[in-house]
Amino acid sequence: MSILKSKKMIGALIVGIAFLSSTVAFSAESVKIGAMFISSGKMGGYGKHARQAIQLALDEINADGGILNRNVEAMVEDTELKKDVALNLARRFVEQDRVDFLMGPTSSGIAMALTEFARQNKKILVLTQAAADALTGSKFHPYVFSTLSNAMMHSRSGAYFMAAKPYKRYMCVGPDYSYGHSSWNMFKSKLEQLRPDVEVVGELFPKFLSKDYTEFINKVLAIRPDAVWCPLWGGDAVNFITQALPTGLFEKVKFVFPVAGALEVLVPMGRNMPSGVYVSSRYFFTSPDSSLNRRFVKDYYTRFNEYPDYMAGETYAGVYFIKAAVERAATTEADKLIAAAEKEPLAWETPEGWKVMNPVDHSVVEDCLWGETSYNQKYGFAIPGSFESIQGEEIGRTAEELKAVRMEYDKRAN
């Protein structure tokens, strides 16, 4: 039986001072979260949705008695997509604000620096947006927990999704940093395993936050692959799609976007989002049709006048992971919480369904959804439909890979 099916059997604007600006101090007895996301520039929507989700989650939790009868508070700051800014924020959170948990960031590149900071300071970092698989793989340490499906999981799910389709000649157009490369490498490796007949005909890695994609669009048109794996996200995905539309690229080549099912892409594209593009998103507000998700979407829309993006869904889930982990451990003390989380898998319910924290690599186990874009008159933008679910057991680390992660960590730790 699937773990994701069997786990169903496991049984004012702000309430109080639950959500704080950087000029307000935490109260002494609260459970404290220091969160960092990109909240400015063309990727700023990621931080905005994260902030709103944290507000909503904390209000719910505190209205229900908090965590261990303690109020929960958070500060949310802007990393500006800069490592030094993020590290300074983390240092302030730990040394001055005395937070119990760090949360974020958006960029995997910044997360690589923050995870080392968390290890050195023995402070738990909850990853809710950064997705490079190395964060719970080659860079694993016990103080990091990832509550969203990482690049490896999404890439493997994409390989399963595409393996049943007739395409043979593949190439990649992805951002030139850790996430883009790991996303492609994992997709390619799993697809070649499932479909030995596929052929890789090109790999293109434009600079992150590129403004002009003409060179890369022309190369795809010249090579004319059957399909393109394209892990561009946010404003980069919007710019690429917008610039490619006049060329008819999406009628000539099937594009597969592992994160373009995000509202950060679909809403600004509006009617211009091409139909028939394969997309995934770690959470999409129309699925699942559960009471929890319906309530979350309704409350979020009522409060913020917009639908929750995947950053909202995943960050909301991250806050509730902290609640579940603290309640199991009966403490916020990092080492005791880690020990409790590693005794057995920890399951908690979220708007996107049940999530399970793997006690070995601290990665979430969950299904991944894929769909195909089509314009929706009700919402005024394209949404994915005809969802296909790839089960979590198929896309997470194997028993051998999990063992290798801990063995490698033990070597580094000793």
Residue ranges of predicted features:
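Extracytoplasmic "Venus flytrap"
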Residues: 34-55, 77-84, 106-107, 173-181, ...
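Sec/Tat signal peptide C-region and signal peptidase I cleavage site
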Residues: 23-27
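Segments of small-molecule ligand-sensing domains
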Residues: 302-312, 323-394, 412
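Extracellular/periplasmic Venus flytrap/periplasmic-binding protein
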Residues: 88, 133-134, 141-246, 286-295
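Beta-alpha junction/loop-to-helix N-cap segments that form part of ligand/metal-binding clefts
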Residues: 45-52, 60, 64-137, 147, ...
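Bacterial N-terminal signal peptides
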Residues: 11-22
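Periplasmic-binding protein-like
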Residues: 93-106, 126-128, 171-174, 224-234, ...
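Bacterial N-terminal signal peptides that target proteins for export
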Residues: 2-13
